[in-house]
Regions:
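Charged, amphipathic alpha-helical oligomerization/scaffolding segments
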Residues: 71-74, 78-81, 85, 103, ...
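Structured alpha-helical bundle/scaffold domains in large eukaryotic membrane-trafficking regulators
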Residues: 91-98, 124-127, 131, 161, ...
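Non-transmembrane, amphipathic alpha-helical segments
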Residues: 43, 60, 64-78, 96-107, ...
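C-terminal accessory extensions/subdomains outside the catalytic/core fold
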Residues: 19, 23-37, 244-298
């Protein structure tokens, strides 16, 4: 038996009305129950629970850590910029008089100390009572650049490479008075990895310094740098495997720098009796141009 269209539509409307009435009654009962439990409030799906309170606390903690990470990262960038300026200033030493050399090294020493007492100390204060390994990636680039500048300055003063213990000592800030003597001193964590990568960067600066010394007839300094680079290369080879992908690329640059210094010293030994000292740098530049032109283009 067929049901008329009007009757079928009437039944549908009746069902819809019943559903609306049922939902309305359910909502009314829910609101009444919420008012009895929490007067003046209305229950909702976002009602606070203990679990949600915990997640809100976790969110605040993460926001604080992210903000601190960003501040440390910005300070690290400033350390990188200022350390590069110190390195560039010391690269101007070849050809200067002894008095000018001492003045420039003194200025560089003051700049390094200022970096330590301002930017790096700010990083140490940010990391007080924090796990430094959670933030080490934020300041590793600046720390490596600072170690490169410090080791370059130390080499020009003493002819040796600064030790890891010395770097950590310079970045440990003790208490200012006796009342704070019992407090744990502030410090920037210098992992062996950062120290090794920073010293690896030094080899490129020593190579540039050596080539500049050739044109100023400071031949003894060239041979000294060559000997130091050879000793460093042997030390790096003795390290074995180090879980740092950056070290592989730095070692490639290290080998290239050592090769250039050895070639410069070899050419210097052969030609210093034939070519004036002020022309040797032009000779080396000519050789470099010939080698670069002979390399096939990929």
């Amino acid at each position: 038996m067929l049901i008329p269209v009007e009757q079928n539509q009437s039944r549908k409307n009746s069902l819809v009305q019943r559903l609306v009435l049922l939902v309305s009654q359910t909502m009314t009962e829910a609101v009444s129950a919420a008012k009895e439990v929490l007067p003046g409030t209305i229950a909702s799906p976002s009602q606070d629970t203990v679990l949600m309170d915990l997640f809100r606390e976790y969110s605040k903690t993460l926001d604080k850590k992210n903000d601190k990470y960003e501040r440390v990262y910005k300070a690290s960038r400033d350390v990188t910029v200022r350390s590069k300026r110190v390195i560039f200033s010391m690269q101007r030493i070849p050809g200067l008089s002894e008095e000018e050399r001492e003045t420039l090294l003194g200025t560089a020493s003051g700049d390094l100390r200022d970096i330590e007492q301002t930017l790096l100390k700010h990083i140490a204060m940010e990391l007080r009572d924090e796990d430094p390994y959670q933030f080490v990636n934020a300041y590793t680039a600046g720390l490596q650049e600072y170690i490169e500048a410090l080791s370059f300055h130390h080499f020009l003063l003493t002819g040796s490479i600064v030790s890891h213990e010395e770097v950590q000592r310079r970045l440990t800030y003790g208490p200012q008075d006796e009342a704070q003597a019992a407090l744990v001193p502030l410090s920037v964590l210098v992992r062996p990895k950062e120290y090794i990568l920073g010293v690896a960067d030094l080899t490129g600066e020593l190579m540039r310094f050596c080539i500049k010394c050739v044109s100023t007839a400071d031949f003894d300094k060239c041979y000294q740098i060559c000997g130091v680079l050879k000793a460093m290369h042997g030390g790096f080879l003795s390290l074995g495997y180090i879980p740092a992908k950056e070290l592989y690329h730095k070692m490639m640059v290290f080998k290239s720098s050592l090769h250039k210094v050895e070639e410069a010293c070899y050419s210097l030994q052969l030609r210093k009796s034939e070519v004036p000292a002020d022309m040797l740098s032009d000779v080396f530049a000519m050789y470099d141009a010939e080698e670069n032109s002979s390399v096939p283009l990929l």
